[in-house]
């Protein structure tokens, strides 16, 4: 993820943040907005399951951030969420199931707006006003960095699948033990 993060153009990312902030929060409200923290995606014995599509189905405006690990999705979401709260809006933060400190999606019910992510964990293909963060990098990655990213990605998915397999087996054993 650090390889991707190094390639981001901070000026372009700042433009995304300002654009989103101005489009979502057209007026200020009185006071500081409250927040709620939840998970929309989970690691289960049956694999990775996400409910972001169902949770976002009633929202009129959907922004989609697409990008792999290290593309700054959490930073963007935290900034937009914090800005919304400062302007008085209630923000729902959906956390990443692997690293709960990271944010996967945010929902702003008062404006019927959400920012959801297509990412390496949920592997979803959400539709909406899309920002493909790969388009906001400084320049083409060197071949060695591409090779490192590919290796890391392959290893990540191999370990994820192994972990899910172990959770699945533990679940089966748990069910068997409970039958006694």
PLM regions with names:
Residues 24-27, 72-79, 96:
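A broad, low-specificity signal for short, low-complexity segments enriched in glycine/proline
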Residues 48-54, 77, 118-127:
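Anaerobic metallocofactor- and corrinoid-dependent redox/one-carbon enzyme cores
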Residues 13-55:
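N-terminal pre-Walker A segment at the start of P-loop NTPase domains
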Residues 1-28, 148-180:
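An accessory alpha-helical subdomain
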Residues 49, 59-84:
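Glycine-rich phosphate-binding P-loop
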Residues 1, 83-161:
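Conserved nucleotide-sensing/catalytic segment adjacent to the nucleotide-binding pocket
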Residues 49-53, 59, 108-112:
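Accessory recognition modules or surfaces
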Residues 34-39, 78, 85-89:
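N-terminal start-of-chain detector that recognizes signal peptides
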């Amino acid at each position: 993820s650090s390889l991707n993060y190094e390639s981001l153009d901070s000026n372009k990312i700042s433009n995304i943040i300002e654009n989103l902030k101005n489009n979502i929060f057209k007026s200020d409200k009185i006071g500081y907005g409250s927040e709620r923290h939840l998970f929309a995606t989970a690691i289960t014995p049956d694999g990775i399951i996400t409910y972001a599509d169902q949770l976002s189905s009633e929202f009129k405006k959907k922004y989609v951030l697409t990008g792999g690990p290290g593309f700054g999705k959490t930073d963007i979401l935290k900034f937009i969420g914090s800005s919304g709260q400062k302007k008085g809006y209630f923000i729902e933060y959906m956390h990443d199931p692997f690293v709960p400190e990271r944010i996967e999606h945010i929902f702003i019910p008062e404006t019927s707006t959400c920012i959801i992510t297509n990412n390496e964990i949920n592997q979803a293909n959400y539709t909406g006003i899309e920002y493909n963060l790969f388009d906001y990098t400084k320049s083409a990655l060197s071949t060695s960095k591409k090779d490192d990213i590919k290796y890391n990605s392959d290893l990540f998915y191999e370990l994820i699948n192994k972990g899910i397999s172990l959770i699945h087996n533990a679940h089966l054993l748990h069910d068997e033990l409970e039958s006694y």
